[in-house]
Amino acid sequence: MKNSKRTGRRQLLRLGAAAIGGGLLGQHKAEAAETAGNLGIPLGPYGERSPYEKAVRWTRQSKTPETGSSFTPLADSVGTLTPSSLHYERHHSGIPTIDPAQHRLIIHGMVDRPLSLSVEDIKRLPSISRTMVLECGGNSGSEWAATTGPDVQRSFGLVSCSEWTGVSLALLLKEVRVGPGASWVIAEGADACRMMRSVPLAKAMDDALIAYGQNGEALRPAQGYPLRLLLPGWEGNTNVKWLHSLRLTDQPYMARDETAKYSDLMPDGKARIFTYRMEAKSVITFPSGGQTLPGPGLYELTGLAWSGSGKIERVEITTDAGKSWVTAQLQEPRLPNAFTRFRLTWRFDGREAVIASRATDETGYVQPSREELIAVRGTNSGYHFNGMKFWKVHADGTVTNAEV
């Protein structure tokens, strides 16, 4: 397999070299065209992207203006990190404006020493940075009923990957001295609906983070400024934004967003609740729905894979609708609970092809097909969909959802 990867790259490079050689004839004209005719834009206090870059989030508004979601343009992304400005958003009751100088995090309930901490108090504590994915529990939710998503953004865009900086929650819980019998932490946000989620104490003491930074700067208001709870590998809704209260209890709160919402109604009429962990998932981002290949030739298929259970171990790609699979190359480093980019050199011969990816994580869990997922869970749920996504590359190079 390694030899075939090297051969594919050499073929691509040879084609590129030939194109460059032909382009040398117009070198002087190109140099003249690329010379700026003015001094350009002045220095500014905050960096802006080039006006030639057009990638934006796709926004889906709910019934009220305070609620809604916006989807990351995954097909336009490079590497594995999502710019903060393109990170997906999901709001249930607006985005509050919070003065960090007035904000407090209260840790109370079944503890010996309740604490009220300012943002500056938290920033003075030993901090860590962690690269991790956040994925909304409802990401790809429409795929349960029908795989009608026309492109990656609208089918898979409620997921993003950032570097987060903050303080270990375990450190704070050791300071308050959790009392005997406490087994849950009720996290509450400072938004208008005071959104709450119940978190098992074991998770809080494991890898939970009280974050104040994202991608090298302070959290943005839409991402929970000034403080956010981060729970690696768990559905986005549990990562409570605008965090202001952590209450230790001996039972879950049974809040709306962990009973009526973010639960999975099964075929037998029973519901799975507290289904926190997001399972292994992947999607090809190029070529994908809405894109066009200019003609037959060699291309690099690429996409993203992630798992709430740790590292991605393997990604396989099919170009014949699942009849055969080839192992893709994984970009290093492969981090737990983070995006892993995969690549495979592929020759498009001008005939119709149906492509998809399938991820396997370090636990051995294999991403299922939609049919395999529905056979177990039915179609009553709108959450936790991680089935494979198939794209159809037509003979003319256009790419569409293979199942529409």
Predicted regions located by residue number:
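Structured, non-membrane catalytic/scaffold regions adjacent to prosthetic-group chemistry
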Residues: 33-404
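Sec-dependent N-terminal signal peptides of Gram-negative exported proteins
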Residues: 15-25
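N-terminal secretory signal peptides
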Residues: 1-11, 18
